[in-house]
Amino acid sequence: MNIRSNPDTTRPAVTTGGLPSSKKIYATPAAAPDLRVPLREIILSEGAGEPNLPIYDTSGPYTDPSVTIDVNAGLSRARTQWVKERGGVEEYQGRDVKPEDNGNVGAAHAAKSFTAYHKPLRGIGDAPITQYEFARRGIITKEMIYVAERENLGRKQQLERAEAALADGESFGASVPAFITPEFVRDEIARGRAIIPANINHGELEPMIIGRNFLTKINANIGNSAVTSSVEEEVDKMVWAIRWGADTVMDLSTGRNIHTTREWILRNSPVPIGTVPIYQALEKCEGDPVKLTWELYKDTLIEQCEQGVDYFTIHAGVRLQYIHLTANRVTGIVSRGGSIMAKWCLAHHKESFLYTHFDEICDLMRKYDVSFSLGDGLRPGSIADANDRAQFAELETLGELTKIAWAKGCQVMIEGPGHVPMHKIKINMDKQLKECGEAPFYTLGPLTTDIAPGYDHITSGIGAAMIGWFGCAMLCYVTPKEHLGLPDRNDVKVGVITYKIAAHAADLAKGHPAAQLRDDAVSRARFDFRWQDQFNLGLDPDTAQAFHDETLPKDAHKVAHFCSMCGPKFCSMKITQDVRDYAAGLGDNEKAALYPAGSVGMSISGVIEDGMAQMSAKFRDMGEHLYLDAEKVKESNKALS
């Protein structure tokens, strides 16, 4: 049920209420019985003959009817207590919000501030702070227990099927276990193969994990600009994106009220929030890259660390010596962050301050456990530029920086392209694994062709499914508005659903143990003509039912054994069902007549012909109408039985 509630004019409206025939459930890990790990249970119809299906859920408390949502107050900050219990942190006053943090916006255009204030935490001394440091010391945190329970989707009871799925897939070197334990999570993080993006100041977070040996995740980008959108719209877009399955959200705001927008989003977000700090730093120096300084950038990092941003995209691999490699490209440097740093390097003829101060950036981010998302500022912006020397030179540098960040105790993932034709995708994954020590890969698509403006969610979804199969851990969505404009609410949903399809297809191909459970449930519902179950098991129940209802709108059609594609006469599944039922009900003498010894093909043919004849007679007897009353169909079925 989609309810956009706005009880007063100062509170952003967000979507609450559960999805059709679903309820929020909570799993309790044996290792930490005080934790409540959210799942969504899809409730199947009474005649389904199978249990309800638990699935991964990113929607937070917004779909839990027992929780009262107050966007002004923000979400519960249960995780803050976990951080404090571990020790090694201090609470402090933090920096004051400065006018330039919000673009020096005037009073007439200033957004309403988030009123609740929480003193920030930061790490002190040499005690472990980051999930990587805990993992390296052999310590299992509550976050690790939480994500292990979340990834399993209640499949402990279905290990036999899980092992069969593993055997059937092609994982390209990934090692997904049949059942995920907290120790497995710890080991993957300790090896640098997975991250839990979880700033110690994001107390509202429901922890999740990014790594190729886990479910493939997706990210949704939101954010205002200098010409469009507002704080209210961006908070609503965040809630809307996670409703449909976004595992993380990046706030790429570039206009007014950047700090305020981010605060509202963070205080109301149960998923990790990422940013590109150079965007805000640029706003603080009037949009002129030449005026950027290390001191200004560092202050911006501290500002965002204190707010609770979980991961930063930092384009530290855009080095002065690589910029000339883009000169002969068709589309040059298309990354906004990459172009900002390239201009700074050329204007000052110096090495990037992101590269020269990388050690200091690591020390700062470690104090708050902000994860690195090492940006691909030289990614190809057209398939003509894919896999060129500029792209791979930067990737090699990102590998070097990954090792530095690990040595400093930081969590790291690597960003990737971009625009890459299908036959050049796998080499990107292979090279990233080699150069970056198997750190998680996070790609924008890639887009597999450049000919479809307005449909780039499809061109990129193809590449995303492929690279996800090859081992990419998180896929950044592309909406239909890519290259054309800022996505609205509907574009966000289309982008998220498209990328959920790509991620799920990748998990199926890898042989992820839990992936096919949902596919099989949909298939059984489809074969049994359980229309409502088929809608509700899908990624987008509302759209599925709307498409069905365009041609068969009545409630009676929800039990009809056909759809508008074939009609009642030509439904292959209905005919198959009738053949099965008919053959099962034959007596021995009837079977002998239809199944002569040594003539298996003839016997099957006889059953089919007889079944077809009965269906033909039944159709004529009921008036040869394309659409039939459900009650009459039921009566006819009783007469045949």
From Swiss-Prot:
[4Fe-4S] cluster binds at C563, C566, C571. It catalyses: 5-amino-1-(5-phospho-beta-D-ribosyl)imidazole + S-adenosyl-L-methionine = 4-amino-2-methyl-5-(phosphooxymethyl)pyrimidine + CO + 5'-deoxyadenosine + formate + L-methionine + 3 H(+). Its cofactor is [4Fe-4S] cluster. Residues 1-13 have a biased composition (Polar residues). It is an enzyme of class 4 (lyase). The keyword S-adenosyl-L-methionine applies. Its EC number is 4.1.99.17. GO terms for molecular function: 4 iron, 4 sulfur cluster binding; carbon-carbon lyase activity; zinc ion binding. Substrate binds at N221, M250, Y279, H315, S335, R336, G337, D376, G377, L378, R379, E415, Y442. Zn(2+) binds at H419, H483. Binds 1 [4Fe-4S] cluster per subunit. The cluster is coordinated with 3 cysteines and an exchangeable S-adenosyl-L-methionine. PANTHER family: PHOSPHOMETHYLPYRIMIDINE SYNTHASE, CHLOROPLASTIC (PTHR30557:SF1), THIAMINE BIOSYNTHESIS PROTEIN THIC (PTHR30557). This is Phosphomethylpyrimidine synthase. It comes from Rhodopseudomonas palustris (strain BisB5).
